[in-house]
Amino acid sequence: MRHAKSAYPDGIADHDRPLAPRGIREAGLAGGWLRANLPAVDAVLCSTATRARQTLAHTGIDAPARYAERLYGAAPGTVIEEINRVGDNVTTLLVVGHEPTTSALAIVLASISGTDAAVAERISEKFPTSGIAVLRVAGHWADVEPGCAALVGFHVPR
């Protein structure tokens, strides 16, 4: 999931930017969509940026969260390394991050087999704030690598 729409207050460092009112509303919508359409989230991996943390808070998802500084400005490989650290007791993981990493990660993880080509194309064109890519992974989180997942959905709450 990409963080929700952020504000741009003067004098605030990028890492510390808060959500805009629209972002607060859309993060809530994202949480509602996640609860209605996917299995319960067991764990969250979230950027330490204020807007990412606030996005998670406003989704209402109350799963245990690990905040990783490395997710801010990360390359897809760095996010994969963080995913590889997730325990096998987790079946549904929510990753809250930033662009352009979130879209690149979804495309990098997507395999040809099982991936919805139309979804991949939509993500390649634009991954708006609060966008949620849904990937299915078989096996252990420690084994997640490029091409290991089926990209099966994409939702932008509005």
Swiss-Prot record:
SUPFAM superfamilies: Phosphoglycerate mutase-like (SSF53254). Coiled coil: none annotated. It holds the Pfam family His_Phos_1. Its EC number is 3.1.3.-. One of its GO terms (molecular function) is hydrolase activity. The keyword Protein biosynthesis does not apply. Transmembrane segments: none annotated. Keywords: Hydrolase. Belongs to the SixA phosphatase family. This is Uncharacterized protein MT1313.
